[in-house]
Regions:
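Short C-terminal tail/terminal secondary-structure segment
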Residues: 19-22, 73, 158, 169-182
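Substrate-binding pocket helix/loop in short-chain dehydrogenase/reductase
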Residues: 23-25, 32-34, 134, 138
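Active-site helix of classical SDR
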Residues: 48, 84, 92
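Residue(s) in the substrate-gating loop at a strand-loop-helix junction
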Residues: 68
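Short, small/polar-rich loop/turn modules that mediate ligand/substrate recognition or access, typified
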Residues: 100, 105, 168-170
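C-terminal helical subdomain
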Residues: 108, 130-164, 168, 177
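Short, flexible catalytic-loop segment of classical short-chain dehydrogenase/reductase
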Residues: 111-125
Length: 182
């Protein structure tokens, strides 16, 4: 539909994610695991499958996949989410290699927690009696001391979508408020 309307696809921001229920692996439900993997990993795969084909044919384009800092490390209690976001990081690298000979760039962004409804749900899962305490606990893991603002993410996506990043592909960008420095 996009190609029919606009003639080509210049940029694809492959951004979707759910956390699922917070629980140790031994308490995780396989159905819940599959649900998280379907949205977070299969969704990215399907986006790549269809958009990468178009971009390879047109010999240009930029794809930005959203993973998470959890896709570069481990985070107790959200194993399905962590596994799904590690998979996104791997898919990004493969797509970058496959797209590079055709002028298609593929990168991943790895945000720390972002001020969104998804984080409110996760905080409630970690501490149903005091979600604000859960938020403060997560913020203590971030040296800057706060969640990312959606605009923080948008700024990096705009850079990766632009010609200013024409020699960048297969990269993993952390937007983590200093978490990697610890």
């Amino acid at each position: 539909a996009a190609v029919d309307r606009f003639g080509k696809i210049d940029v694809f921001f492959n951004n979707a994610g759910i956390v699922g229920k917070a629980a140790p692996i031994v308490e995780q439900d396989a159905t819940e695991f599959d649900k998280v993997m379907n949205v977070n990993t299969r969704g990215v795969f399907l986006g790549l499958k269809h958009v990468l084909k178009v971009m390879i044919e047109q010999k240009s384009g930029s794809i930005i996949n959203t993973s998470s800092v959890a896709g570069l490390m481990a985070w107790e209690g959200i194993a399905p989410y962590v596994a799904s976001k590690h998979a996104v990081a791997g898919l990004t690298k493969i797509a970058a290699l496959e797209g590079a000979p055709y002028g298609v760039r593929v990168n991943s962004i790895h945000p720390a927690p972002v001020e969104t409804m998804m984080m409110r749900q996760l905080e409630s899962g970690y501490n149903p009696d005091d979600p604000e305490a859960a938020k403060k606990g997560v913020e203590q893991l971030i040296p800057i001391g706060r969640y990312a603002d959606p605009q923080d993410i948008a700024n990096l996506v705009l850079f990766l979508a632009s010609d200013e990043s024409s020699f960048i592909s297969g990269a993993q960008y952390r937007i983590d408020g200093g978490m990697a420095a610890k």
